[in-house]
């Protein structure tokens, strides 16, 4: 039996495990409120005058931050796997994240001089949350026995989902207002008086996400055990990068089936993330949705994703992981094409429908209802694809390579995360079309699916 390292973290008590899982709850508003449903659509459709140009800038900022994260991940991963405490690194990257989120406040409508500040702030927040997550993930194996790692990981995933839904419901229900009515999603006056003419509610989403993070990450810092002691930083970097190169060579030479799956997953995960990041932006551009509609849209989509994840677990045991991924991908791609087929006065690219009439109420037009339907399809598919991807890897990798290959699994989710956003930014800038720009994500999804087909489901 291998002996424990002298500076290894002690197994966590219940409050330590809950504290670790709350990291996902703490970070989720960044993804839900800022990246997907509220601030990003405001940046494109409210902060700047030209939505296509704004989308390309937002995509470039996303891609640049993800590229930086991908470049730093191997080095930081080596540090995280060495005998160094993780919490100081998480604290440092948390400061980056919170400062970046607070910088989004400067996105006053029409303030073109603030565009570089806002984009830099968003990139800083993105880099901070991605790198803090590297160290938080590295804490997990030392907190609980190996046979219960899946349970802990699943708990954190569920807690993160709940955090996104709760933060979205609170902000949309009590703070962010419809510019036309001055009311929140619940029909209430905002809990804090804010200037609608300068879109203070939308701009406050960043600082609120930062404050949410500071409050709910505290249990992790206070109660979750960490490694103690220290070794020099240089040694684990050299050793970790050397091991990474050796492991990559072994993967490509002796485990090509696993390598093919990781390549497929890298592409379809990148495309799927891009659809989520830019789908809300596109919907808001087409129908002129404000914070109220976007909040409701986000809640509906998140609930759909939750139910999809629940169903996917049952299907995985019934028809197998690969079949679930393929089936989920077909639904996801159909939903993404459907979303892009919707315009203000047409659906399915050429079927005419009556345009939106503001006085008829929220989501009253046929185009909006079609957009919701296709978005729910995406939500239903994304959970099963994510969960079954992890399960498939566990089933096809050799038992003695599980930890190593799951490291590649995590790494593959980051290494090309910049590609789809940068491609979307470039195509949007070249064509001036938001629809054509976002359609690039379909290429990643389809190629990833095609590469998955020959993957064997046995070791």
Question: Where do the PLM segments sit?
Answer:
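Helix-to-loop junctions at the C-terminal end of transmembrane segments
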Residues: 71-85, 307-321, 342, 347, ...
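Central cavity-lining transmembrane alpha-helices of secondary-active solute carriers
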Residues: 58-78, 168, 299-311
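Short amphipathic helix-loop junctions that connect adjacent transmembrane helices
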Residues: 32-55, 277-297
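Loop-to-transmembrane helix entry/capping segments in MFS-fold secondary transporters
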Residues: 52-56, 146-156, 291-292, 399-409
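Juxtamembrane intracellular "pre-TM" segments in multi-pass secondary transporters
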Residues: 2-18, 225-263, 356-362
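C-terminal ends and interior cores of transmembrane alpha-helices
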Residues: 91-112, 330-364
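Cytoplasmic membrane-interface "Motif A"-like loop-to-helix N-cap segments
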Residues: 80-96, 317-332
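Multi-pass alpha-helical transporter architecture, strongest
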Residues: 105-106, 212-223, 342, 438-459
């Amino acid at each position: 039996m291998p002996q424990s390292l002298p500076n290894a973290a002690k197994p966590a008590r219940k409050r330590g495990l809950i504290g670790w899982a709350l990291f996902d709850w703490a970070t989720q508003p960044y993804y839900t409120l800022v990246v997907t449903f509220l601030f990003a659509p405001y940046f494109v459709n409210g902060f700047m005058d030209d939505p296509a140009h704004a989308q390309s800038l937002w995509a470039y900022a996303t891609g640049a931050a993800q590229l930086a994260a991908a470049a730093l991940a191997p080095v930081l991963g080596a540090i995280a796997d060495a005998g160094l405490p993780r919490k100081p690194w998480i604290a440092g990257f948390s400061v980056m994240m919170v400062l970046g989120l607070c910088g989004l406040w400067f996105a006053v409508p029409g303030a073109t001089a603030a565009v570089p500040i806002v984009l830099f702030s968003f990139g800083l927040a993105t880099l901070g949350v991605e790198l803090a997550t590297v160290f938080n993930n590295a804490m997990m194996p030392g907190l609980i026995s190996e046979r219960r790692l899946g349970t802990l990981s699943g708990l954190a995933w569920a807690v993160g989902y709940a955090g996104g839904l709760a933060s979205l419901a609170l902000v949309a229900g009590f703070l962010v207002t419809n510019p036309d009515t001055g009311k929140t999603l619940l029909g209430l006056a905002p809990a804090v008086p804010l200037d609608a003419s300068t879109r203070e509610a939308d701009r406050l989403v960043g600082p609120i996400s930062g404050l949410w993070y500071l409050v709910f990450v505290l249990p992790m810092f206070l109660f979750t055990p960490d490694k103690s002691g220290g070794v020099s930083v240089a040694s684990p970097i050299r050793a970790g990068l050397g091991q990474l190169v050796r492991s990559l060579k072994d993967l490509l030479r002796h485990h090509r089936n696993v390598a093919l799956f990781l390549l497929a997953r890298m592409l379809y995960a990148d495309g799927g993330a891009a659809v989520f990041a830019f789908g809300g932006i596109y919907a808001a551009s087409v129908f002129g949705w404000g914070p109220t509609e976007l909040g409701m849209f986000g809640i509906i989509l998140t609930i759909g994703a939750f139910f999809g994840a629940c169903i996917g677990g049952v299907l995985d045991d019934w028809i197998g992981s690969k079949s679930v991924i393929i089936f989920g991908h077909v639904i996801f791609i159909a939903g993404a094409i459907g979303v892009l087929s919707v315009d203000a006065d047409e659906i399915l690219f050429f079927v005419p429908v009556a345009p939106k009439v503001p006085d008829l109420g929220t989501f009253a037009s046929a185009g909006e209802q079609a957009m919701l339907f296709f978005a729910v399809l995406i939500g239903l598919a994304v959970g099963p694809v994510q969960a079954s991807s992890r399960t498939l890897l566990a089933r096809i990798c050799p038992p003695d390579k599980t930890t190593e290959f799951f490291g590649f699994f995590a790494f593959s989710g980051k290494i090309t995360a910049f590609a789809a956003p940068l491609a979307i930014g470039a195509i949007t800038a070249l064509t001036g079309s938001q629809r054509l720009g976002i359609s690039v994500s379909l290429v990643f999804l389809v190629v990833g699916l095609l590469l998955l087909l020959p993957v064997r489901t046995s070791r």
